[in-house]
A protein has these predicted regions:
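Transmembrane helix-loop-helix hairpins at membrane boundaries of multipass inner-membrane proteins
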Residues: 2-6, 13-173, 246-260, 287, ...
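Hydrophobic transmembrane alpha-helices and their helix-loop junctions in integral membrane proteins
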Residues: 140-194, 204-497
Length: 498
């Protein structure tokens, strides 16, 4: 239990310290120290809880009511933040959704759950261990990379506007708070507390995407928050349904009940699946993740690899035992995921902006994970988990490489990366490694897609197999194109007309 508490509390402490410290050297030292500590804690967590089986840790019953009030306070704080920003920037839709969340949160606490026991249990399983490693190692690594990147970013801001305020303390505080919220999502068993962490990630993403405060950044930040608030409202109403009908708020008990009596939980499962689809940026909600590319590169890397979108597919994978026996939500999830994978893979071919290629690739791979979760068989679930692991590692590397290349060559356009192997050989090698990890044998993504194909074949669903085949062909095309741009080497000019 101490390890779990440390994983949740340590990033919060780091966020608070980084929020008040203005000195560059002190900020660097604290961020690196806490990032290293989070990574070490994640590895220690994996060592302790590795292996089959699940572990549950319940907090004392007398903590239930205070924790319930803390939970409500965080819910209201997040919603009020959104209301304030929506009023400031005159966004009525975001204002309406946030106001609705406030009303539902109060109703749920003081009417639906009035007098009910608030049980706070932490649950660790194999998927939770994998997610902790991804969040703790990849996420903290991105935070360290952001130190150098944001120094250059601030220097550029000062060059453009000598009066520009240094907002890096906010940036790093939000980054570390993001990690804490993600640890909450993957480790907590209480669905009300999971919802709270879910909405915290939505707010953190909003603040990071709109960090530059340009008109484009603000528009894309509100697009993100509106789409994810729709999912948040769906999540809330699933909790209300469970409370009204006396069904368990324990996620593990809910999944067991749904697997045994799928008709009983069809509505809340469908609502939760909708929440997962919006968070995972699946069509037609994919545009918020494309818009997130206006944010600084560390934000893009964090959103795509270890946080936010991974929360969406994590929820869907956790619900997979119910999808395996419940036709309606299963068909919805499989259809959305399969079409997203195929269509976004083809959309990526037409892109020359490296970050947009990575964004479409991320959405496509999340679609494949979503489809696997919707199938719900053990083979499909393990294929989804493999995709989550290998995609997180490769995509974080690629985003960081693209950000570094943009700083040095002044462009993120793939067409401008000709002869990058000669100009920046070390960076080009890392970028090529990341690209090959996405589609070349013997790297993990190819193995994961093979596992996906096997699981789809076993379902007998021909449409799924066709979508996988066409999407994979498109994937090969845009990665091979990018790889070719990087690997070109200039030679001596030769007259071929002689």
């Amino acid at each position: 239990m101490e390890l779990i508490a440390s994983l949740i509390v340590v990033p919060v402490v780091a966020a608070l310290l980084l929020l008040v410290i203005k000195n560059d050297r002190a900020r660097d030292a604290i961020a690196i120290a806490f990032a290293a500590l989070i990574a070490v804690l994640s590895i220690a967590f994996a060592v302790v809880f590795a292996g089959p089986g699940t572990y549950e840790f319940a907090l004392p019953a007398e903590w239930g009511h205070p924790l319930s009030l803390v939970n409500l306070a965080i819910d209201l704080t997040v919603a009020i933040f959104v209301v304030c920003y929506a009023v400031r920037y005159k966004r009525p839709f975001a204002l309406g959704l946030a106001a609705l969340q406030i009303v539902v949160a109060l109703w749920f606490e003081f009417a639906v759950q009035a007098g009910a026991e608030f049980s706070m249990t932490m649950r660790v399983d194999a998927l939770g261990v994998i997610m902790v490693l991804i969040i703790g190692i990849v996420g903290s690594g991105i935070c360290v990379y952001a130190l150098g990147y944001m120094k250059d970013f601030q220097a550029h801001e000062l060059h453009e506007n000598p009066q520009a305020r240094d907002r890096r303390p906010w940036f790093f505080a939000i980054m570390f708070a993001f990690l804490s919220a993600m640890f909450n999502i993957v480790l907590v068993d209480n669905m009300a507390w999971m919802y709270t962490a879910w909405e915290v990630t939505t707010l953190c993403s909003f603040l990071l995407i709109g960090f530059t405060k340009s008109e484009e950044a603000i528009n894309n930040a509100f697009r993100q928050i509106v789409m994810n608030l729709l999912g948040g409202v769906a999540f809330q109403f699933s909790l209300v349904y469970l409370g009204v009908f006396g069904l368990p708020l324990s996620f593990s008990m809910f999944v067991e009940l749904g697997a045994a009596f799928p008709a009983l939980v069809m509505l809340p499962v469908t609502l939760l699946a909708f929440a997962g689809i919006t968070k995972a940026a699946q069509m037609p909600f994919h545009t918020w993740l494309l818009g997130a590319m206006v944010a600084p590169t560390p934000t893009s890397a964090l959103l795509h690899s270890s946080t936010m979108v991974k929360a969406g597919v994590f929820l869907l994978v956790k619900l997979s035992p119910i999808f395996a026996v419940s036709l309606v939500p299963s068909v919805m999830v499989v259809l959305v995921g399969g079409l997203t994978f195929a269509l976004c893979s083809f959309m990526a071919i037409s892109q020359s902006n490296a970050k947009r290629v990575l964004a479409y690739s991320t959405i496509a791979n999340l679609g494949l994970i979503t489809a696997c979760a919707g199938v719900g068989t053990p083979e499909a679930v393990w294929a989804a988990i493999l995709l989550i692991i290998f995609h997180a590692v490769a995509k974080s590397l690629l985003f960081l490489c693209v950000g570094t290349a943009e700083h040095h060559i002044g462009s993120r356009n793939i067409e401008d990366m000709d002869l990058l192997f000669e100009r920046m050989p070390r960076l080009a090698r890392f970028m090529m490694l990341g690209i090959m990890c996405m589609f070349v044998a013997p790297f993990g993504m190819l193995i994961a897609k093979w596992a996906t194909l096997v699981s789809f074949v076993e379902t007998g669903n021909v449409a799924l197999i066709i979508l996988l085949a066409f999407g994979s062909a498109a994937t090969f095309m845009f990665w091979a194109k990018w790889l070719g741009k990087l690997s070109g080497i200039a030679g001596e000019p030769q007259n071929v007309e002689l």
